[in-house]
């Protein structure tokens, strides 16, 4: 059964030493001779989950070549790491690529200018900047709606008015 990364971080003690299944996109991949690290994000949480994979996996050489943006399905055991930078990590028992990503995928693990992100508007939601902006806007909108609802206001969603719906006089 799928577990969201947000759940793993929120209830890490409950998931300790248990097998979980996650789906997400590779943010980074650092491979070494005997093991490697994938940072995977599923969009449910700002933080990425570090996945540790080792040479015991039959597709180790394939995993070590996964690029940024590849979609994956991973099964593994959650290990708490209180002395490390991250609170927990996932030790992979299987890693499966669901969708490849082209070599020229524009969103790489580096800082991008806002001008560049305007050019790839369909991908900017996958960046940390826009992920944070969307989360803040969501919380702010919810707070505003709750305030007005609790004070007896009615929310009316009016249709947009555009000039294509209006009849304009013709000038001769």
Regions found by a protein language model. Give the residues of each.
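OB-fold nucleic-acid-binding modules
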Residues: 1-23, 98
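Residue-level marker of beta-strand positions
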Residues: 19, 71-73
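Short beta-strand segments
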Residues: 20-22, 47-51, 88
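Short, surface-exposed secondary-structure boundary micro-motifs
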Residues: 25, 77-78
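Short solvent-exposed strand-capping/beta-turn motif centered on an Asx-Ser/Thr pair
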Residues: 29-31
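OB-fold (S1/OB) nucleic-acid-binding surfaces
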Residues: 35-55
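Extended, charge-rich, solvent-exposed interface segments
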Residues: 56-71, 79-158
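Conserved small/polar residues in nucleotide/adenosyl-binding loops
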Residues: 164-170
């Amino acid at each position: 059964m799928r577990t969201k990364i947000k759940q793993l971080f929120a209830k890490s003690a409950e998931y300790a030493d248990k097998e979980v299944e996650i789906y997400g996109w590779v943010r980074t991949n650092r491979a070494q001779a005997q093991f490697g690290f994938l940072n995977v994000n599923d969009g449910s949480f700002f933080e990425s989950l570090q996945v540790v994979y080792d040479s015991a996996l039959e597709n180790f050489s394939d995993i070590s070549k996964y690029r940024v943006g590849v979609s994956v399905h991973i099964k593994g055991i959650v290990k708490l790491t209180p002395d490390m930078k991250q609170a927990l990590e996932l030790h992979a028992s299987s890693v499966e690529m669901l969708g490849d990503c082209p070599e020229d995928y524009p969103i790489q693990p580096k800082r991008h200018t806002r001008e560049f992100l305007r050019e790839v508007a369909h991908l900017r939601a996958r960046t940390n900047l826009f992920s944070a902006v969307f989360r803040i806007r969501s919380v702010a909108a919810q707070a505003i709606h709750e305030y007005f609802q609790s004070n007896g206001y009615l929310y009316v969603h009016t249709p947009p008015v555009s000039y294509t719906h209006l009849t304009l006089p013709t000038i001769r």
